[in-house]
Amino acid sequence: MRHRVKTKSFHRPKEQREALFVNLAIALIEHGKIETTVQKAKALRPFVEKLVTLAKKETVAARRLLNARLRNNTKAATKLFKEIAPLLKERNGGYTRIYKLDKRRRGDDAQMAIIEFVEHPDKE
């Protein structure tokens, strides 16, 4: 039984929701920051933080698990291991930051946000 286990469904089945988080995480890793809704950014944060914590371990098992979680996207996994994780090595969590934007999405008036890594190699 799933007592007290609550996750946002985003009105999607489980597989679609997991695919959404994987795709958002890959975009965040590749670009350093992405613009999405506040709800998706808040739901994405723990998923990405677990990936970064896993990448900081630098073991073969961690690399294989990370590749499995990112659906064998080796480009994103390599960037996470070689560029992002070393920058966040001294940090114990809190790898991402969420900014709420004043603008809203045109179609449904959803509040937008930017989620980004606190330290990122592509940062200006």
From Swiss-Prot:
The keyword Ribosomal protein applies. InterPro entries: Ribosomal_bL17, Ribosomal_bL17_CS, Ribosomal_bL17_sf. Keywords: Ribonucleoprotein, Ribosomal protein. Pfam families: Ribosomal_L17 (PF01196). GO terms for molecular function: structural constituent of ribosome. Coiled coil: none annotated. GO terms for biological process: translation. GO terms for cellular component: cytosolic large ribosomal subunit. SUPFAM superfamilies: Prokaryotic ribosomal protein L17. Belongs to the bacterial ribosomal protein bL17 family. Part of the 50S ribosomal subunit. Contacts protein L32. This is Large ribosomal subunit protein bL17.
